[in-house]
């Protein structure tokens, strides 16, 4: 896409990509999202969203996750927090091409403060924003490390997992019986 001078994010999404985006949207929040809001976010009709949600529910949800529907309120996914995080991680891991990983590692190891990495399946979600914040923080941590000993696959896993954990913790979604401590208690 760079050779053709076309940003791959400008191309309309097919059903598979729309379903990934819908999953990410629904998994990063605890609130219901209306069909119209999802349609506007993906630039498709509400009927397309309804069809995609049916396919998502029948073919893409892991056992233990449930797509909930409520008239005039919207849609949301419920299930065990571990499954929610694993599903998000799986979507993000499968999205990266070899070129994306190369570009991401270059950005992580010697990128500038204003450089930005776009995640196609997480566009316009909290994951996109947090992912780039984590890149900047990790870059500062890696400044003093011996880069020859780094395992890029592990770096990518850490980057994705810290992003997911941060987004989910901001929504007060913890694994097990852990509880968030209020800042006043610290």
Residue map of PLM features:
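A cross-family "folded-core" feature that marks the main globular domain of proteins
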Residues: 1-186
């Amino acid at each position: 896409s760079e050779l053709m001078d076309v940003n791959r994010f400008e191309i309309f999404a097919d059903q598979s990509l729309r379903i990934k985006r819908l999953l990410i949207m629904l998994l990063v929040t605890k609130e219901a999202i209306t069909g119209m809001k999802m349609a506007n976010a993906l630039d498709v009709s509400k009927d397309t969203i309804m069809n995609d949600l049916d396919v998502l529910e029948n073919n893409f949800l892991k056992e233990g996750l449930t797509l909930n529907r409520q008239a005039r309120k919207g849609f949301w996914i419920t299930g065990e927090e571990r499954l929610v995080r694993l599903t998000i991680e799986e979507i993000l891991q499968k999205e990266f091409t070899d070129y994306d990983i190369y570009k991401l590692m270059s950005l992580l190891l010697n990128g500038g403060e204003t450089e930005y990495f776009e995640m196609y399946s997480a566009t316009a979600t909290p994951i996109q924003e947090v992912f780039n914040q984590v890149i900047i923080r990790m870059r500062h941590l890696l400044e003093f490390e011996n880069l020859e000993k780094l395992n890029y696959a592990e770096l990518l896993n850490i980057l994705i997992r810290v992003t997911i954990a941060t987004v989910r913790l901001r929504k007060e979604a913890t694994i097990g019986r852990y509880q968030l401590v209020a800042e006043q208690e610290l």
